[in-house]
Amino acid sequence: MLLPRIPHAFGRRRGPSVRRPARALLVLLTGALGLALAMPTGATASPPPASRAATDIAPSATGTPLRDGTGLYPRAIRLAHSGSANGRVLAGVVTFDGNNGIGAIHESTDSGATFRQVGAVADPESAAGQGLCCATLFELPRQVGAMPAGTLLWAASAGQDESNRRMALRIWRSNDIGRTWSYLSSCAVAEGTGGLWEPEFSVAADGALVCHYADETDAAHSQKLVAVRSYDGVNWQGRHNTVASSRAPDRPGMPVVRKLPNGTYFMSYEICNPGGQYQCVVHYRTSADGWNWGDPAHLGFRPETADGRYFRAAPTIAWAPTPGGGSNGRILLIGQRLLNRDGTPAAGSGRTILTNTQNGSGPWSAMPSPVTVPNPEVNYCQNYSSPLLPSPDGSRVLQIATDFEGTVCRAYFASGNIT
C-alpha cells in the first residue's frame, strides 16, 4: 500500500515503498494513515478530503513550540560525555528549506525550559527534493575508533524521492556540540528501490556502534528490523535480522534501543499489518549484549497495563533512575495512540506514558505525559515518535511531541513529574 503524499517527502510509510514524483501537492489528513493501513498490501489510497486536524488554525497540543514552522520526528538527548557541556539538552527535528531537507539542531542550557537553534545538518543527498525522513541524534558514551566519547552522531533516511531511488541511511558527526557537521558514513545503502527507514544507534557490550533500522529491501519480507555494527563508525559489518516475521506482510518498524542498569538491552518497536485491533501495536524484546536478539521470527512481547491498555504505533522508550534508590529504575514508554483491551481508543490517548520498574516484565503503569496531543489519529504527525528525556535524578521527564497547526506539523515541548 501507499500512503498519501506528505510535505517535502518526509515520506515514512507503513506499506511497501514505491517511487513518487519529487514534487507533489501537500495532502495532510488525520485518518489517512489509518485508512491506508486497513487496505490490502499493494493497494493505493486515494486521498480523501483534508480533515479537521489538517485545517484547524490553532494546534490542540499543549506545550511550547520548539521552533517556527515544520518540525518532524523529534529527538532529544542530554549530554553526559562532553566535558563542560554536560547537562545541556540537544533536540533535533526534520525540517525543510524550500525543497531541501534539513536536520535542525536546538540546544537548551536550562534543562529543557527553553531552546534555540545552534546548528543544522544539510545533507546534499537530501537536497533538491531527493527526500529526508526520520532522523536520530546520539552522543557516543565511549570511544569508537578515532571518535572520542561525546562525539555527536546524526543519521536519517535519505533519497526516497530520487528518480532512480537508492535510499541510504547517512550518518553525520559533530565535534563541537552540534554546531557543525561532517559526513561520516552510511550504515546501509539500498541496492534497489526498497526503503530504509528510522535509523537508531546503541553501543553493544563489546564496544561496537550498532545501527538499528527498518528494511524494505528483502523480497521475503514487506519490512523487517535489521542491525549492523561498526568498530570505527566508518566500516559496517555483520548485518542481520533482529525482528523478521514468518508472515511476509508483517512490518516491524521504528526500533529504539536503551541499555538498562542490569546490562540488558531493551528494544521497542511496532509491528504493522496484523490487522484488527493489533494493527501497528507496540512490542519489545531484549538482548544480553545489544547485538544478539534471539530468533528474529519471535515477535516479542506486548507491554500493557493491568487493565489491558496498550500503545499503537510509533513508540519510543527511555530509562530513568528511581528517586531514592531502586536497582531497576523505570522504563518509560510512549506510543502514538493508547488503546483499551478491546482495541477502542482509551481515554488517555495522546496524554499518557507507560512505566515499568521490572525491566519490562509484568504489568505497566500509566502516568500523564507532559505534552498532550488530544485524540491523535494514526498519521505522520500527531504524537508521532515522541522522545522522552528523564532528568538525571529520575524525578521529571522532558517530552517533545508533534501536532498539526493548520497544514504544518510542529514540535512542542514540556516537562512534568514522573509519577
Where do the PLM segments sit?
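Conserved blade-ending motifs and adjacent loop-strand segments that build the rim/top face
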Residues: 301-312, 364-391
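Beta-rich catalytic cores
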Residues: 70-75, 101, 131-136, 195-198, ...
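Loop/turn-rich, solvent-exposed surfaces of beta-rich toroidal or solenoidal domains
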Residues: 272, 279-282, 307-360
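Secretory targeting and sorting signals
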Residues: 1-47
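Blade-level signature of beta-propeller repeat domains, shared across WD40, Kelch, NHL, RCC1
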Residues: 388-419
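Asp-box/BNR beta-propeller loop motif
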Residues: 54-62, 106-119, 172-184, 229-238, ...
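Hydrophobic core segments of beta-strands in well-ordered, beta-rich domains
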Residues: 75-98, 136-139, 146-165, 170-172, ...
